[in-house]
C-alpha cells in the first residue's frame, strides 16, 4: 500500500517514493507543482538551492509563471498527457482547469497509484 502523509499547509508527501506533491521539504527528491499560485510554489527556497538531487516538475505554463515570479531553480517541464518514467514511478499530468497550466498528477508505482488533483475546477 502507498503511504501518504498530509503536509502542514498544502500538499502531501509520498515518503516511500520521496515525492512531494505541492510539498517541498529537504526530505523529498521529487516535487510536483500543480499550479503557480503562491500557496503551491515551494516555500523554502534556501533548502531547495542546497538540495543536490532535486527534481521539480510542472507544466510549461506553470514553469513559465514560476520563473516570472523569480523562481531560479531548474524545473522539468512536463506537458499534459505525456508520461515521465523514473525507476520508482511514472507520472502523467492532466488539465485541472483551475488556472493557466494547472495540472493533476496521476502517479503509478509498484505499490499503488494516486491521482493528486491539487486545486481543480468542478462543473
Question: What residues fall within each predicted segment?
Answer:
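Hydrophobic beta-strand segment of the Class I
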Residues: 31
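Conserved G/P- and acidic residue-centered "switch" motifs that form tight phosphate/ATP-binding loops
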Residues: 35
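His/Asp/Glu-rich metal-coordinating catalytic cores
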Residues: 2-27, 38-123
Amino acid at each position: 500500500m502507498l503511504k501518504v502523509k498530509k503536509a502542514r499547509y498544502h500538499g502531501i508527501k509520498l515518503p516511500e517514493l520521496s515525492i512531494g506533491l505541492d510539498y517541498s521539504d529537504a526530505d523529498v527528491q521529487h516535487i510536483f507543482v500543480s499550479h503557480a499560485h503562491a500557496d503551491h510554489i515551494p516555500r523554502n527556497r534556501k533548502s531547495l538551492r542546497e538540495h543536490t538531487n532535486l527534481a521539480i516538475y510542472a507544466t510549461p505554463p506553470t514553469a513559465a509563471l514560476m520563473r516570472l515570479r523569480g523562481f531560479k531553480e531548474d524545473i522539468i517541464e512536463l506537458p499534459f498527457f505525456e508520461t515521465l518514467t523514473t525507476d520508482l514511478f511514472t507520472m502523467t499530468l492532466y488539465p485541472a482547469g483551475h488556472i493557466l497550466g494547472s495540472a493533476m498528477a496521476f502517479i503509478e508505482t509498484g505499490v499503488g497509484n494516486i491521482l493528486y488533483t491539487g486545486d481543480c475546477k468542478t462543473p
